[in-house]
């Protein structure tokens, strides 16, 4: 009985260590990508981030989106940037949600859509992005009350798309 109990106590520890062993290499790869990006080595950054992004890492997805938006190591492509932002946004990444709002505000890769922009700014603000409320409030000066009502409704009803 004592052996079984000891085994049961060790199982959670082994499980936690297994998870940590999986997460630490992913974080190390992401950090290696950030270090490369910060020194202007965009090819290395993209090589580190792409597999992580494809595996669902929201930070890597946002970083790939930003690379496509800025043309860092890849041709500038707002559509591809948006695709990566959407993947990260679906996981609650507030930076990606903010950038989706910016793209909708300024028509980067999509037609200007103030209602959609307001929606994304609201979602980003709800997830803690400190810049989103200011962008959202500035946008209200360009919107009708009906547009604001619709945008708030969309933000309340927004649910991440499941793959």
Enumerate the language-model features and the residues they cover.
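Hydrophobic face of amphipathic alpha-helices that form TPR/SEL1-like repeat modules
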Residues: 29-36, 48-52, 63-70, 74, ...
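Terminal, low-structured helical/coil segments at or just beyond the last alpha-helical repeat
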Residues: 130-163
């Amino acid at each position: 009985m004592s052996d079984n109990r000891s085994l049961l106590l060790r199982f959670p520890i082994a499980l936690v260590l297994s998870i940590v062993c999986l997460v630490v290499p992913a974080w190390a790869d992401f950090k290696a990508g950030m270090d490369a990006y910060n020194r202007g080595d965009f090819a290395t950054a993209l090589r580190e981030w792409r597999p992580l992004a494809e595996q669902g890492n929201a930070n890597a997805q946002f970083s790939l989106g930003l690379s496509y938006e800025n043309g860092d190591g890849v041709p500038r492509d707002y559509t591809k940037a948006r695709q990566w932002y959407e993947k990260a946004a679906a996981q609650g990444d507030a930076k990606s949600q903010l950038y989706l709002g910016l793209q909708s505000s300024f028509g980067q890769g999509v037609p200007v859509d103030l209602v959609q922009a307001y929606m994304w700014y609201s979602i980003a603000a709800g997830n803690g992005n400190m810049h989103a409320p200011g962008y959202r409030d500035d946008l209200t000066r360009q919107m009708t009350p009906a547009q604001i009502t619709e945008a708030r409704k969309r933000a309340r009803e927004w649910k991440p798309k499941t793959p």
